[in-house]
Amino acid sequence: GEGGAYTKYFFPEQLTFNNYKRLFTETTLLNFPRAFMNTLIISIFSCMISTTFVLSVSYCMSRLRFKMRKPFMNLAMILGLFPAFMSMVAVYFILKAIGLTEGSGLRLALILIYSAGSGTGFYIAKGFFDTVPKSMSEAAILDGCNQFQVFYRIILPLSKPIVVYTILTAFLAPWLDFVFVRVIVGPKDKYWTVSLLLYNMLEKEFVNGWFTR
């Protein structure tokens, strides 16, 4: 077929799966398997940390009563009005100051970025936890359960839909992100994720080798 990113036709002239094979076997110019593994590692660890933070904070806001509860909830709502990338310049310099913008620290830096503010996104899970009858928690406490046991053995099993939703969103956010990866990783192709690698496929030295071939 025609080479390049743009062609004269909309539908492909022939059906082939060779490009999927090439994507994982031809690594001389762009190493897709490495980018895929980088993305998978970052997404899995970010998902684990974020899910733990979100569900824990949601339970605290739903079931516990403490002095700064309302101000914290209001602050979290206000912070949620601003997109995360507004802070990326400050975040970059903080990471640079602690040495996480070079080498293997880049993966850790991205995991920290995606996980750090996840706890403020607790409103949806909190709303679901609010629907679980408090009488069940109170009965468990009377039977000798502590707060962790109530959370782990009663609330979570009754909240499987919101747990699955939290896991999916916590995984997809780093998997699909481009802006922070572009700023933090930059030209260091060893630590590219899939989104950054796909973006670089459009560079003039790569475009003819990957599109409509």
Which positions does each model-derived feature cover?
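A structural signal for multi-pass alpha-helical bundles of membrane permease subunits
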Residues: 1-213
